[in-house]
Amino acid sequence: MKQIDLKILDGRIGNEFPLPAYATEGSAGLDLRALTESALTVAPGQTVLIPTGISIYIADPNLAAVILPRSGLGHKNGIVLGNLVGLIDSDYQGPLMVSLWNRSDKPFTVEVGDRIAQLVFVPVVQARFNIVNDFAQTERGEGGFGHSGKQ
């Protein structure tokens, strides 16, 4: 298991609320919690930025982290990430914040400590461009959206 530096920014972590942890041996994501001062109601159509109480420093340029929605929040309550996916670069050291967007038609209350998103570490390949006039021919070629069919 890869070791990542984590800084606790809110003293409630480790006391009232646990550090982010994998729920099972097969879990890909670690749950991030809402570390607000009090409950927060998100109105329909509103987007809010919520602190998680932690910062991380990945340090390895071959890794990044992504903040992803929790499936139940989106499916059951219409709560998704305001930026759809949050990308955490390996050299970022600031606080992890979660942008929540209420796309439903009902207010949604986020309680202090609620699990609101998940953090997943992913491999990164930094590429260098090779300028060419033409590409090698493929069966697909320039076929774009819908090119491969529906079934």
From Swiss-Prot:
Top-level taxon of origin: Bacteria
Record-listed E.C. numbers: 3.6.1.23
Pfam families: dUTPase
Molecular function terms from GO: dUTP diphosphatase activity; magnesium ion binding
Protein name, UniProt field: Deoxyuridine 5'-triphosphate nucleotidohydrolase
PANTHER family registered for this protein in UniProt: DEOXYURIDINE 5'-TRIPHOSPHATE NUCLEOTIDOHYDROLASE
Provenance organism: Actinobacillus pleuropneumoniae serotype 5b (strain L20)
Family label: Belongs to the dUTPase family.
UniProt keyword annotation of Endoplasmic reticulum present: no
